């Protein structure tokens, strides 16, 4: 993964018209970083991250440790060899209203967390979705956002959701700090956040 060019902002595009949920991740130069596909009809969420558009070169697997729920831990491993990379977990009852995902490293040590900036924005975004015709149009001007923070509460990245009629676009912006988080884990936690928020009605 180290050979990939993680230049920011990174854009993740969630296609709305595919049968199985897919996310395409590109860097600021529009180079493909990851093609992501989530399996349908499984009790435990399972996602494969590929290096190519044709999905022939798997890079990572993301699997829930139990039947989907807010206590599930989504473990990230390398496709070759099964080496642990990290995990993403929604933190209990707090996540029912305001998104909060804890991200750990390969040794299960807390590394950073992802938190919704303003839950009312996402509430308005979901509300507009239910209004015929004008709702989806108005919702294109609503941009829910999330902050990636360290244990001290310092924000290092921002995830911003932008929508169109055929896709959801998530932009991962670096806020100019000097935190040395693994770029692969930051990108993979972005992907898992998109899928988890989709299940909660926020993506």
List where the protein language model places each region.
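Intrinsically disordered, low-complexity proline/glycine-rich segments
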Residues: 1-203
